[in-house]
A protein has these predicted regions:
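Conserved catalytic-core motifs of GNAT/GCN5-like acyltransferases
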Residues: 97-99, 112, 117-134, 147
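Acetyl-CoA-dependent GNAT
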Residues: 3-72, 81-91, 139-143, 149-163
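Short glycine/proline-centered loop/turn elements that form peptide/ligand docking sites
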Residues: 81, 104-107, 124-129
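Residue-level recognition of the GNAT/N-acetyltransferase active site
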Residues: 2, 68, 72, 99-103, ...
Length: 163
């Protein structure tokens, strides 16, 4: 993700989140090059999705991931999550975590394909609605078995979505 992508990112952010991040928050996150990575998915010149991950030692955390609602069900989220997990592995993580709304079953299904398992609930995590978050973890992401799982997931994606 670069500064020039922020207009497209913010358009998606405002569509999918009741309390969107500010452009300044994205810029701040993007400036932490040592342990954070932010990616965009594009169709032509249009930003259609984005995601971010931060790594501390052997743990990584997906900070955000979103796809333009007009482009749901096109495996864009799959590709973003694949690339974020690959980046976590590159940065030395052994495990990665995320939070997801308890009502967001579609995202939970996607995350479970990547080996994320629910480990707890954060009560009232989403302040704007009071909704709880499911905390999910994927362990042993550096293992050969997990890497094979990543390869199977991405090999089923359409050609334009593959690395």
């Amino acid at each position: 993700m670069r500064r020039r992508h922020l207009k497209g990112v913010m358009a998606i952010e405002r569509q999918v989140y009741p309390r969107p991040w500010s452009p300044n928050l994205f810029l701040s996150e993007m400036s932490e090059l040592r342990n954070r990575t932010y990616l965009v998915a594009k169709i032509g010149k249009d930003v259609v999705g984005y995601g971010g991950i931060m790594c501390y030692g052997e743990e990584a955390h997906v900070t955000t991931i979103a796809v333009d609602p007009e482009h749901h069900r096109k495996k864009i989220g799959t590709r973003l999550l694949h690339d974020l997990v690959q980046e976590a592995i590159r940065l030395g993580a052994q495990a990665t975590s995320l939070e997801v709304r308890v009502s967001n079953w579609g995202a939970q299904r996607l995350y479970s394909q990547f080996g994320f398992r629910p480990v707890g609930i954060r009560k009232n995590y989403y302040q704007e609605t009071g909704e709880d978050a499911v905390v999910m973890w994927a362990d042993n992401i550096r293992s050969a078995g997990y890497r094979e799982q990543l390869e199977r997931i991405i090999s089923r994606a359409p050609e334009g979505i593959r690395p």
